[in-house]
A protein has these predicted regions:
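Leucine-rich solenoid repeat scaffolds
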Residues: 138-165
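Ankyrin repeat structural motif
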Residues: 16-24, 50-63, 89-97, 122-133, ...
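Intrinsically disordered, low-complexity regulatory segments in ankyrin-centric signaling systems
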Residues: 1-64
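Ankyrin-repeat boundary/"N-cap" motif
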Residues: 2-9, 32-46, 71-80, 106-118, ...
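Eukaryotic tandem repeat interaction scaffolds
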Residues: 75-94
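Ankyrin repeat A-helix N-terminal signature
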Residues: 10-15, 42-53, 83-89, 116-125, ...
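Tandem repeat domain/solenoid detector
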Residues: 98, 102-104, 134, 138
Length: 165
């Protein structure tokens, strides 16, 4: 019998890596929960509650056929990379980049992860902005509201985000 996504979420939180791997054999990796998240979207937000190492978990999802660039089926339609940036989760972010995540994937509003990195920048080290740009993120992709990451950086007055562009 196939597990539903809510059952797999509980498995992620309460079992070992081997048990998670076994559970994935009975799971449709392309399924979404009622909020529009696939298992990678869920993991990108809840990974600190899972015992297994981040690299191993993401590779396991890839091995079972997850599309690491898939966007949520509802809400803002963000990818796991968008979520990692918004949560400032360097662990997830770095692994997704190493595994080939598209730095220019657009969400339901046309925002790329770099737009989100500019938006959540708060005077910290600029890691997400700099890393995305160095990995080929385009600074000029216009979202559904006519704003690019570079334009957003120029408009933000409370932090000096312009310096990254």
């Amino acid at each position: 019998m196939k597990l539903n996504i809510d059952e797999l979420k509980l498995t992620l939180l309460n079992t070992s890596f081997g048990e998670i791997e076994a559970a994935l054999r009975n799971f449709d990796i392309a399924s979404f929960d009622r909020n529009g998240d696939n298992i990678l979207h869920y993991y990108a937000v809840a990974y600190k509650s899972v015992q297994a190492p981040v690299e191993n978990m993401i590779q396991l999802f890839i091995d079972f056929g997850i599309n690491i660039n898939a966007t949520q089926s509802k809400m803002a339609k963000r990818s796991a990379l968008h979520l990692a940036v918004l949560k400032k989760s360097k662990d997830i972010f770095d692994v997704l980049l190493r595994k080939g995540a598209d730095v220019n994937v657009q969400d339901g509003n046309g925002n790329v992860p770099l737009f989100n990195a500019v938006f959540v920048y708060s005077g910290d080290d600029g890691y997400f902005i700099e890393t995305l740009i160095s990995n080929g993120a385009r600074v000029d992709i216009i979202n559904n509201h006519g704003v690019s990451p570079k334009i957003l950086a120029e408009r933000i007055a409370n932090y000096d985000t312009r310096k990254f562009f």
